[in-house]
Amino acid sequence: MSFATSTAVRPEPFVPVSVPVEDRVHAERGEFAAVLSMRHAGPSPVRLRYEWVGPANAPVVVLAGGISAHRHVASNAQFSEKGWAEELVGRGRTLDPQQLRVLAFDFIGADGALDVPIDTADQADALALVLDHLGIRALKAFVGYSYGALVGQQFAIRHRARVRQLVLASGAHRPHPYAAAWRALQRRAVELGQLQCGEDHGLALARQFAMLSYRTPEEFGERFDAAPEVINGRVRVAAEDYLDAAGAQYVARTPVTAYLRLSESIDLHRVDPAAILPPTVVVAVEGDRLVPLADLVGLVEGLGPRGSLRVLRSPYGHDAFLKETDRIDAILATAFRTSGESA
């Protein structure tokens, strides 16, 4: 073990991005029906949706994010809308689609059509079916953030011959009880909204609670330190506009069933780190309220000589992977270079 410190959900609303001619590479999006043997629900019909960008014969890297992520990671010539990892994938980045084939998929259940318990093992098996469908024997790497990191762990355990290395950010081998309690209360907010015939209101409130767990008190202190206002006889604090917007945006793109089942899926996750055999870089964020540094240290210790730890200090907490893109890119570059040297 080594240590180092470094200082789906429906797609987002369409935001076109201009792609320079010299940066245009081929991308393809598809879907197919399958029957998946699910851990808690048995054989279940599913639709698997994927998108890849890059040369068809290039090494393949899977990129998987949180439960709000989806198959469209970045704008490209075929699909010009902004992706959820727009600043991480592109020309000159480690995840350069001119050099690598970057593949992402919609998590099963993200469309709201699957109302059963979903395990991270099910997601890993779904990815294996996508690889079979595309004729991909093995991955150069699996890069996972948050929920995607959990899926990456399961994929390495259940399909160990199909991935060469892992880079896992903000996702431990088990959920922390504090974070699980946060999510349980968020699900109760949704259920309360359903009882009152206002499930969208419940989902918006759950998302607002989640934003407090994704970010840090330091960031809120810097951004929302203005004095409260009295509006129509009610006191309104500075952060409420931000939270209201976050809730409304999430409701617009997320089925309630998808949120509930994928939130549960995080809390179902349990793996033995010793069963993860590929070399693994674990990225932790000091101040992450959902995945504490100590839990990721425990994951790396369980990995033994196959694991290494990188620690980021960031005011963005759990969202650092999405906000600190230059630093994440540098970690990916080192991880890929080290893997190539040891091959």
Segments from the language model and where they lie:
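Conserved hydrolase catalytic core segment
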Residues: 139-177
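Conserved alpha/beta-hydrolase "acid-adjacent" motif
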Residues: 289-295
